[in-house]
Amino acid sequence: LIPWQNQWYCPQGTQGIAPERIELLDDSVWLGDGSVALVRTKGHTEGNHSIVAHTGQGLLVTSENGVSLDAYEPKHSSISGLADFAKRTGAEVIINGNTQEYVVDQYISMVQEKSIAGPSPVDDRFPNVVPSSEAQPYWLFPGTAPTARSGSFEFGRFVVPA
């Protein structure tokens, strides 16, 4: 492992889970009636998948690849310098900085995610992508508050089959 991966590595991460309960995925898969899919989006990790759901608010993608809606449409960002950086470099998305070993895959996956997602119900200039670790404004870092935030969502409920 490279140094910045050590803190995230879980050597016994599946300990206690029966092997027959683990399903290894090589590609994207549909779940249930097809209204939810796990889409392979290598980048954040080697086996990363994004959850895509057909909701009352359109197609929604949730992922660990980006940290804010600004990352998926930097040209609309109000964060100081972000829109200018995207324009100068031609960057369609802005990757987060914690997985440099897969930077190309992460960039491609973020473009894929925003292409799948419908428009955001919060601000239709942005895709309907909900980062699993969404950036939050913080007073110690002025000027870095996301332009728009997805916030929390609740859709349906889990039901255990009889």
Task: Describe the function of each predicted region.
Residues 1-40, 86-95, 99-108, 113, ...:
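Metallo-beta-lactamase
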Residues 26, 42, 64-66:
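Residues at the C-termini of beta-strands that transition into short coil/loop
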Residues 30, 42, 52-54:
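Well-ordered beta-strand positions
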Residues 39-48:
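Histidine-centered catalytic micro-motifs
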Residues 52, 56-162:
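Cap/insert and terminal regions of metallo-dependent hydrolase folds
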